[in-house]
Amino acid sequence: MRVAFKIAYDGTRFHGFQRQPNLRTVEGEIIKALNNSGIMYSDFKSASRTDRGVSALGNVVAITTEDEKALNPMVLNARLEDVWILSAIEVPQDFHPRFWAKSKVYRYYLPSIGLEVEKVKECSQLFLGVHDFSAFSRVDGRDTVRSIDRIEVFTLGPILIIEIEAKSFLWEMVRRIVKALELCGLGRLSCEEIKEMLEGKFEKSKKVPPAPPEGLLLVDIKYEGIEFPLNDKALKKFKREVEERFRQKIMGAYLLWDMIQLL
């Protein structure tokens, strides 16, 4: 049978998703957990090989196995740290998590201090539709034409969230779009300049750099006719452990925020 897992992970704890010799990676930890649980498997495939520092709430991996234990997320969760299996379902035998994906949804969390939010919202709409994103990606030989289906900008406290949905993305594409929007919000890049870059009018030496990977979250990967019901026990474990990390980090973050406000 073919089993697909919806997984979440804290990307700041890993050297990226893909296995690398002598480095801790998301893929490496999942494979280690499969081996330690005694689950025999083959044809391990993933939907997105996120970069170092990038986190996920809804990445998807799949294996072929005859072991029913694979359908219980807690079997692997008991052997995982910083990675959480939120759902495990049986899928068609030819399922490939990357090629079957209908769309991917990313969110970037950007401090809104000093940003003109309305300008960011205005410029963000320029990216909708089909464009050549060579100015907003790390070119690796692939076709640089992509289509963005949706882009939304909204605030959550002192954070500006930029959510982008598309069928596929180029390397560093989301982070470079975010950086361009940040520069717009700071008044250092205009909407007209972004429009020109999307039309190919730019110097390669002056491409927009990527925003830091730590602010990027792979929220979801959508499939036609395939749903991932969350496992109750897995969800409780995930929320408990992530809430504890949030409590630890929010104290330091708001301490620094208050220092700014007090002066």
Curated annotation (Swiss-Prot):
It catalyses: uridine(38/39/40) in tRNA = pseudouridine(38/39/40) in tRNA. Substrate binds at residue 106. GO terms for molecular function: RNA binding; tRNA pseudouridine(38-40) synthase activity. Gene3D superfamilies: Pseudouridine synthase I, catalytic domain, C-terminal subdomain, Pseudouridine synthase I, catalytic domain, N-terminal subdomain. One of its GO terms (biological process) is tRNA pseudouridine synthesis. Its EC number is 5.4.99.12. The keyword Lyase does not apply. It comes from the Archaea. The keyword Translocase does not apply. Pfam families: PseudoU_synth_1 (PF01416). Keywords: Isomerase, tRNA processing. The active site is at 51 (nucleophile). HAMAP family: TruA. Formation of pseudouridine at positions 38, 39 and 40 in the anticodon stem and loop of transfer RNAs. Belongs to the tRNA pseudouridine synthase TruA family. NCBIfam families: hisT_truA (TIGR00071). This is tRNA pseudouridine synthase A. It comes from Pyrococcus abyssi (strain GE5 / Orsay). The gene is truA.
